[in-house]
Amino acid sequence: VDKVNEFEHGIDTVNKSRSDSLYFGSISNEQFRYASSDELLNTDNGKKVFRGMIEAFFNSQQKRLKVLSSYAKGDNYSILSGNRRLDNEKADYRVRHKWGGYISSFATNYVIGNPVSIGILEGAEKKQLETIQEIEWNNDINALNGDLALDASIYGRAFEYHFRDKDGADRVVLINPLEMFVVRDLTVEQNIILAVHLPVFADKVNMTVYTKDQTITYKPYTTNAVRLTVDTTTKHEYRDVPVVEWWNNRYRMGDFESEISLIDAYDAGQSDTANYMSDLNDAMLLIKGDLEALGLSASDIAKMKDANTLLLQTGISANGQQTSADAGYIYKQYDVNGTEAYKNRLANDIHRFSRIPNLEDDRFNATSSGIALLYKMIGLEQVRKNKETYFTKALRRRYELISNIHKAINKPTIEASKLTFTFHPNIPQDVWNEIKAYIEAGGVVSQETLMNNASFTDYKTEQGRILKETGASDNEIMQLVGGMNEQES
């Protein structure tokens, strides 16, 4: 018989054990390392180790990445695959919450939602910035940076691949982390010695390996039968592996990876609530009394229940006493306050440990000043600083690769070591309060600055309008302000 008050523990069904927690073994995020790419690809022992790396990637690392992907998309693995209420007569809602996607999207847009500014150190050639701007334009680099940062936030790692297209333009493209891994050397610098791209098409792995001077393709094979048969080998002139690995942090962990158990508990709590509300509609009818004296049979009770009517008439028992009858429903007790407090606590813990501020917190919204707001976001600020450190390494390697290929083919020089990268956190700024405070402190602000900070106009547009009102011709306006930003006659 089902026990009334053990619903929330999930032990009121034939499934006596419910385990939804996930644990990724150390190999699932292990860095692959070897002495050199030549030994790894061309010696018997190296090939054996290389085959083991590929198998470990498919059997262990890719599984972790797929689980993280499911949480980022809201198809939370545990709630959908865990053993829960298997009784056919009971509700079995699997309520998913896109916490993973929310956390990664919030953190990514905060850190890199605004374009990264590239500058140069004093004494560096300024003309190289024009070359960099052309490369960024050709590759829609702001969108690419956003995608890379999002992958890093979800998976803990992200990959970009470099090549030159048929028109001789520098290309940088995103590679799915579920389809690539890198191998690093055994030095303290842990340099990348090769990158392995393993996309699967028609159930076949179409593997390509990139070394510091070669691109090697292999004949297709299945994931459960790795075969290292070289198909083609071509040279490249990057003088390094043309792949950049972006790290999210020191441990290559996703922003919500440590909070998965909390997300699972939140999903389970909401699912249990939904199940309770559904099962309450199917509560068991209880009739107490001398049913024999009432003359009721099981079929009589069933007919009355179907008619949504229950008639109970008392009478006199055989010994002359008055009979009694009572009817009601048995339903499982639900501690509303306790359950809601539990789910709120889980939600707060998810925010706390992921360092993502809870924007629905009244205490958060009550804060109006910018500096106080930043204090409440101090946790996310620490995450941002850490991400920027690793993203800067990736960006510098990006331009080192481009610099290498430009030197090899006599294209415009890029001094990667002299580039600076400035990140701009995507947070609302009260610019007008700053301007007001600056003016009150004795500072002078130009009309151009004031107009450019207005949401409804800008300097060129407004100056053009003013000149036009004074009778200036279109040619005069063009010479003075360079034309207006809006289409006006």
Question: Model-predicted segments: where are they?
Answer:
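Glycine- and charge-rich intrinsically disordered segments
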Residues: 1-25, 267-281, 285, 292-293, ...
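Short secondary-structure junctions and interdomain/linker hinges
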Residues: 61-64, 75, 113, 139-143, ...
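C-terminal helix-loop subdomains that flank or include functional centers
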Residues: 299-320, 338, 345-489
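A short, surface-exposed helix-loop junction/capping segment
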Residues: 128-132, 325-328, 377
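Extended, regular secondary-structure scaffolds
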Residues: 149, 153-154, 159-255
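Extended, helix-rich architectural segments
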Residues: 1-173, 489
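Short amphipathic alpha-helical segments
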Residues: 124-128, 136-145, 152, 258, ...
